[in-house]
Amino acid sequence: WRKRIGDASALLAAALLAGSPLLVYYSRMFIHEMLLTLFGVAAMFALIYRAPALITGTCIGLMFATKETFVISLAAWSAAGCLLLFEKSMPRWSFIRALYIQHRVAIALAASSALLTAAFFYTDAFREPRGMFDAVKTIFVYETSSGHDKPFGYYAQLFALPVKSGGAWWFGTPLILLAATACIHAFGKTPPPQARVIRFIAISVMLHTLAYSVIRYKNPWLACLPWAQVCVLAGFSLAGFSNRSKATKAWIVAIAAIAIVTQMLQSRQAIGRLASDERNPFAYVPTRQDIEDLEPWLKKLQVIAPGQSIEPIAVIGNGYWPLPWVLRSFENTGYWQNPPPDLASMPIVLAMPEHAAAVAKQLEATHQPLPRGLRTGVPVMLFVQRDLWQLWMRHDPK
């Protein structure tokens, strides 16, 4: 692909992708959107440069297996392809039919490999056939939790408008200017050789942005794949660079330098001192430091109590994310919507706010309560069996 894109464009796109504060921030954690972004960019280039049908289909199948929102990308790319096909005039039906006949085998192979790839994961290697039915069903029956509705311009505000928060400036304006420069050249009178590719990605970005802006459920990580496409599009600002005027060359070089430097500075803030701070625009409902410290603390507790086990660990209530991720190294962890009768026998208990009072009463004689913060505005109560707590206090009285 580097040979097709051009060395300079590929290098700039890679730098913008690697330095993007949005992508850097969410690459630090397990979240489906980063896999979707990886497979999505691969699928986009496979479509653009007509990779073998099986490779293209596999990339799309991996997107399907990762997240149901892959249909937005598939629709955007299909629409972009159709618009480019019809950009000069409406082709005759005979041309469309001939085009279909020419590519029908490739289309069938790509569709088959996409479905087989997705089915492999959704059916647990074809052992649970119903999984594929549920995968298709979720596209049409989609529920979201409350509190995430945002206005139409949420993503424009997040990326295009400079905002000062937490002592740092947050903006993606230089990158958007580079992408706009690439579009102006591609749609202009002297387009570069990669003009059709640039137009395809530009239309894709606009359709992705429109789709995600119309959907009321919004958060930063949903923009990972569209923003990755913006980074690639911005890289194409260097396409046909040698044929540009001196003023245009100076503009592109200056904006590219500003984009790379400012993105790097924002990324350092995003994953540094503001990693779990709600003033970081990418730290959406961030996890509190209390919970980030929980796993290492529990492991220390296990070390100083070799004759006892800190498992099973019980989590009581709903809305407990990211506890499953934090407690992933503890195999014997259970989740209950309501406190079970044998709760007092469990060494470690975490209770969500709606059950904290009831659990505190049930464990009053056996456990030490320790208030903690889970996410912004969401407390959680940690209960530790008293003998374990006494061991810890003797080990570390601070």
Description of each model-found segment:
Residues 344-398:
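Aromatic/acidic, Gly/Pro-rich catalytic loop(s) in extracytoplasmic/lumenal soluble domains
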Residues 16, 25, 35-52, 59, ...:
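Specific aromatic-rich, kink-prone transmembrane helix
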Residues 56, 284-285, 289-335, 339-341, ...:
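Short periplasmic/luminal acceptor-recognition loop of GT-C membrane glycosyltransferases, typified by
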Residues 25, 58, 64-198, 206-216, ...:
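Transmembrane-lumen/periplasm boundary regions of multi-pass, lipid-linked membrane glycan transferases
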Residues 22, 28-33, 69, 219:
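Short acidic/glycine- and proline-prone juxtamembrane loop motifs at membrane-interface regions
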